[in-house]
Amino acid sequence: MTNQDVVVSEMGIAAGAALPGGPAGPAGGLFACRSAAASMRQTYLDLAAAAVAARSASCTSWADAMRASSPTRSSRSASDVDEFTAWVRKHPSALSKFEEIAAKSRGKKIVMFMDYDGTLSPIVADPDTAYMSDAMRAAVREVAKTFPTAIVSGRCRDKVRNFVGLSDLYYAGSHGMDIKGPSSNPESALCQPASEFLPMIDEVYKTLVEKTKSTPGAKVENNKFCLSVHFRCVDEKRWNALGEQVKAVIKEYPKLKLTQGRKVLEIRPSIEWDKGKALEFLLESLGFANCGDVMPVYIGDDRTDEDAFKVLRKRGQGLGILVSKCPKDTNASYSLQDPTEVMEFLLRLVEWKRKSSSSSLMIRPRV
């Protein structure tokens, strides 16, 4: 995706850019910014999911909720393997079902959306060292040459861009609240629906850093329009106290909301904006808002990616792929187990697209 700029005013998109596989021209108005019979096994999974949901809803402490959102499995039992096998039947591997995905994508304009942590890079203890491999970077580079591509992350936009190290992509940081295209101007942003919250976010960041100093292993990350309190390196016995500390701080800021991810507490502005809204915004800004032959593909591993999966299901258009090694309640249609499988899928998708494009050129009749 080269030579692409999209300029957005407060009320709408002023201009759209020509992209690989995408239309050129202005987009529409701005959006308001995944050992019994199969049936018995499915019933078991449904009941298990309901039990997890009920348990989360009735948590009497933050530690309970934090455990529910960040399950830890040092090893898999036979029942775990059976459960995962049944889950994969419902959310099959995007690799084993690649031909099916290719058939659904044939003749469509593919637009790629990917989370960063846990999708393009492994989950690590220190979020500042979540580097992607050179092989993954090369794969993403090929994807961006072939399809319009965006990285949608909870991270600060500039930080995730530095991790990825590629310029020809769209970057949506802070869970989609800070979107920028491949422009030469580092200050030009496409969309920042939570700009008014910046002073408040900075204030809360300083308070949380001070309050969590007493908790060994806790790390507060400023993602510009949202904050992350990582507890992956915190002793589980301290989770409840840490959760209460964070909760007490956020209680003083009714315009902010507290949510949970994979061993992380997220503080975000209470506005109607998430990764799903970011996906819709990017599709519109690229000129695909009302395009019947577009195929958005979203790959992510976190609970916040579910907002994007829901949008794709609601549209009845596109593919959601959850990256996970354990069963999760998800709106994604397909699954991949880890970043290694993500990279394999990306390379196969690029290879398929290039072969199919070459084939269509070969059989094109002369005029």
Curated annotation (Swiss-Prot):
Kindly list the cofactors needed. Answer: a divalent metal cation
UniProt EC number: 3.1.3.12
Which pathway is this protein engaged in?
A: Glycan biosynthesis; trehalose biosynthesis
Q: Report if keyword Transmembrane helix is assigned.
A: no
- Which cysteines bridge via disulfide bonds? none
A GO molecular-function descriptor: trehalose-phosphatase activity
The record's top EC class is: hydrolase
Note the CDD domains from the entry. HAD_TPP
Q: What's a GO biological-process term for it?
A: trehalose biosynthetic process
Recorded catalytic reaction(s): these are:
alpha,alpha-trehalose 6-phosphate + H2O = alpha,alpha-trehalose + phosphate
List, alphabetically, the Pfam families matched. Answer: Trehalose_PPase
Asked if the Swiss-Prot or TrEMBL record annotates the protein with the keyword Transferase, the reply is no
Q: Which UniProt keywords apply?
A: Hydrolase, Stress response
| InterPro entries on file | HAD-like_sf, HAD-SF_hydro_IIB, HAD_sf, OTSB-like, Trehalose_PPase
* Record function comment: Removes the phosphate from trehalose 6-phosphate to produce free trehalose. Trehalose accumulation in plant may improve abiotic stress tolerance.
Q: Which family does it belong to?
A: Belongs to the trehalose phosphatase family.
Q: What is this protein called?
A: Probable trehalose-phosphate phosphatase 4
The organism of origin for this protein: Oryza sativa subsp. japonica
Report which gene this protein is encoded by: TPP4
